[in-house]
C-alpha cells in the first residue's frame, strides 16, 4: 500500500530542498518527523507539512497504521522560475530569477 502526495510551485530552490530530502529518504515516518521538526532549514517546514499530509491520507484513505509507515520515495524536481527586475543605476535593470520546485513524496508500509 502506497500513498503519494505532490506539492508544486514551492518557493524554494531545488538544490536547497534536496539537502533536507536526502536526510529523510528511507526513514520511518516518526523518525522523519522528529528530524524535520528540529531542522533549521526553510525546506524542512514545507516538507514536514507534506509528510504529515501524506500520513493523514494514508491513515484516512487506506486505513494504514502510522507506526508501520516509512518514506519510500521522495524527490524534488525543478519548477518554473519567477522572473523579476531589480532597478540599477543609470536607468538600467537586472534580471532576478526566483526559483520554485516540485516535491514528490510517497509513504508505504514497511
From Swiss-Prot:
- The protein's name is Large ribosomal subunit protein uL22
Record-linked HAMAP family: Ribosomal_uL22_B
Task: Give the GO terms filed under biological process for this record.
Answer: translation
UniProt-listed InterPro entries: Ribosomal_uL22 (IPR001063), Ribosomal_uL22_bac/chlpt-type (IPR005727), Ribosomal_uL22_bac/org-type (IPR047867), Ribosomal_uL22_CS (IPR018260), Ribosomal_uL22_sf (IPR036394)
What Pfam families does its record include?
Ribosomal_L22
Q: Which family does it belong to?
A: Belongs to the universal ribosomal protein uL22 family.
User: Which PROSITE patterns does the entry link to?
Assistant: RIBOSOMAL_L22 (PS00464)
Q: Can you name the source organism?
A: Nitrosomonas eutropha (strain DSM 101675 / C91 / Nm57)
Amino acid at each position: 500500500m502506497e500513498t503519494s502526495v505532490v506539492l508544486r510551485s514551492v518557493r524554494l530552490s531545488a538544490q536547497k530542498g534536496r539537502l533536507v530530502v536526502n536526510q529523510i529518504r528511507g526513514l520511518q515516518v516518526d523518525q522523519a518527523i522528529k528530524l524535520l521538526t528540529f531542522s533549521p532549514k526553510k525546506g524542512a517546514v514545507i516538507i514536514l507539512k507534506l509528510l504529515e499530509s501524506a500520513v493523514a491520507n494514508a491513515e484516512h484513505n487506506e486505513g494504514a497504521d502510522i507506526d508501520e509507515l516509512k518514506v519510500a520515495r521522495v524527490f524534488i524536481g525543478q519548477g518554473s522560475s519567477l522572473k523579476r527586475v531589480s532597478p540599477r543605476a543609470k536607468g538600467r535593470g537586472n534580471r532576478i530569477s526566483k526559483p520554485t520546485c516540485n516535491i514528490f513524496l510517497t509513504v508505504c508500509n514497511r
